[in-house]
Amino acid sequence: MNEIKEPYIVQNDGQSVFYEELLKNMLEVVQRLSGNVWTDYNPHDPGVTLGEAANYALTELRYKFGFPLVDYLTEENIPFTPERFGLHSASDVFATSIVTVDDYRKLLLEEVPEISNLQIDYNVSTNGYSISYVEMPFCRDCEKIPEKIISVYNEHRNLCEWLDKVEKANTELLRFESEFEIQQGEDATTVLARVYWCILHYLADDPTSLSVRERTEYELYKQLYKVEGIKCFRTCYLKNNVDSKLQPDIIEEPQSRFKNNSTLLIPSKLEDLARICIYCGNIKVNIDLDRFRDKLEGFCWENRTKKNRDHVPQKALKGTWRPIFEHYSIANDMPNCYGLSSHNANNSFSAYIGLFDWIIKNGLEKAKSLPQMLSILKQDEGFAHSLRTIRQKSKYLDFLDEMYGVESQPSWLKEENCYGESPVGILNRRMKFLRNIARLQKDRAQGRNLLKYDSEGNAPTVKEWFCLLIGATPDDGHLVSNVLPKHNLYLLEKKDKRNDNFQRLDSLLINEKMMDPENVHEVGYVELAKDTDGKRKEYEEMRSVLPFFNENLITGDLFRNGTNLKNYKILKSIDYDYMLVYHHMEYDGWINLGHNTSIDCLERLANILRRFLRELNRECETIYLFEPVLADISRPYEVVIVLPSWTYRFSMARFRDESRKLLRSLVPAHIDGKMYWISEDQMRKFEFYYQQFLATFTNNKISPFRNEILKAMCKVLSYTDPKDIQSLNDSH
């Protein structure tokens, strides 16, 4: 028994060690379990044969699971893309948005190739910017430069920042005068074009590498000496360009230091080249003026267009698709004498073999589904169909949360799942949030693009973050005050002056015997339609059967707390068989919603109403953020945040406090402001003025009234109850 027997099938060296280890362990276990019963090792024993076949299958499985992880995330004909799994590139994750004046300057120089230089002045008292620019030589659309600068600025504008003016700079025009020698075989016209481009580039260089004081004649000369084709300079000057006829008293003098708005006079006629002498040896060479200008124009545009920006190369992680997910049954490796063929596979031994196959197949199927399991893309949202899959995917999303330092499902969102969000719905909401997390973190301080009135995809990043987190629509074009009117409903709050309507809505004539325990039926959960057409038919049925909706009025209490099925009861009445009633949670009183002879019918209607109110609550949730400084420069570092107060979640003190903490963390620290939780009546007026406020930036006819519209919005907010106002100032 101590004799070591070699396997009778020779394996490759890479796998044989693992196979031998499996075989050794198998024999030790069998020997230990059998004791003195099994005294001889025979390769043809059924147990040995089965063990060896299983060991071969495990050895093959080890090979299949030995590839890099990226290969298992690569599907056939679908290349590996890290963003699919929430693994954003380093350039997206660690990139910083526009913050400083230098950031804006570099951005505009990259995005607007028609300018060679610009000066940005920042007014700290108003948080506004003024831009003066220097045109690029040979610019053809000079009149469009201010429009392009304004457009680029507004695409990257931060909260509470605004653009005061854009104007052409008063440039200091310099004339190049020089005698220099070129190398043998060089074209003088081309070399002169290179010299002019070197000077232009130096005068408009990046501010992070050169300050105004360092733009000196000496530094420029060092750059010119490196120009291709230059042998040496005999003289080299940059003089202020003076028109002797208009300014006879001013003398042209060489400049040793250059201003930030300095630029170079480009020769347009031969007389402009009179003070430039180029030699090849001792021979003076001539310049072709037209070809010189063409060459210089080519150099200018070649080096100023966006396509020639220097980018840091990114290492692309690549995966290889592996066709390893098919399993060759262990039964196929067993001799025919065991009767394991497909025609005779119903015996217990075959079922025992099938258990091995099932375990291996199950593992391979899970490995094959790994791309869908870890994907956060919209097309893979339907993959999570079992509770186990949902738990596994939730853990992966938790990992992404920790990696990016965010919470896509904070505890205060989990506490009250009053809108019946399913586990799959929670996953989809978290996936949508994490798909955008790199952009949200990078552009956290970014404001709305004021030049785009169309609100789709155009909102402050703070609003996008908040709305994506709670599952609301992040566009400013979604007007929540239109939600209830679309369904022909009017919200009636208890604090409304028209309290007589409550007397009509409350069923005060309910017989007290109806409230006896034997006459009260709890409302249970009923499965409803999930498709759009099915929902529409159910809502039409609800509106037609429940007479409550004949009033077109709905109390705020019912609107909010009707999202909970426990607040509905079915009562046995005298005149009618059964009544569906709702008990107010915020004040005393009952509402008779309707009656029917069937408990099942009323129970189903209660479930339909509950789902209907959940959808309305969710649709009524949004956030508005506007910057008063855009109309009133005396309020430079202030934002006003407006939210509806009439939904279930938005009426809860805990939810409001946590929302304030989140928004405070998102709004830049130097910006203060207030949060207003306003009623539906206030929101209707506010949204009207807010849309007009946005229109003032694209409609010149109403732009003079911007400040008046701001005052109208602030007046609407002034009627907010003090308990519904929160400060973003943590010191308060």
Residue locations for each model-derived region?
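Single conserved position on a long alpha-helix in the C-terminal lobe of the eukaryotic protein kinase
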Residues: 35, 41, 49-81, 88
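A short, surface-exposed helix-loop junction/capping segment
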Residues: 70-92, 200-210, 638-644
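Hydrophobic/aromatic interaction determinants used to assemble and anchor large protein complexes
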Residues: 1, 691-698, 705-732
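A short, exposed loop/beta-hairpin motif centered on an aromatic-Gly-Thr core
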Residues: 537-548, 585-604
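Membrane-proximal bilayer-interacting regions
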Residues: 205-252, 257
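Short aromatic-glycine-(Arg/Gly/Cys) micro-motifs in beta-strand/loop hairpins
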Residues: 569-589
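Negatively charged, low-complexity tracts enriched in Asp/Glu with abundant Ser/Thr
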Residues: 528, 533-559
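Carbohydrate-recognition loop of C-type lectin domains
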Residues: 1-49, 97-214, 220-223, 266-532, ...
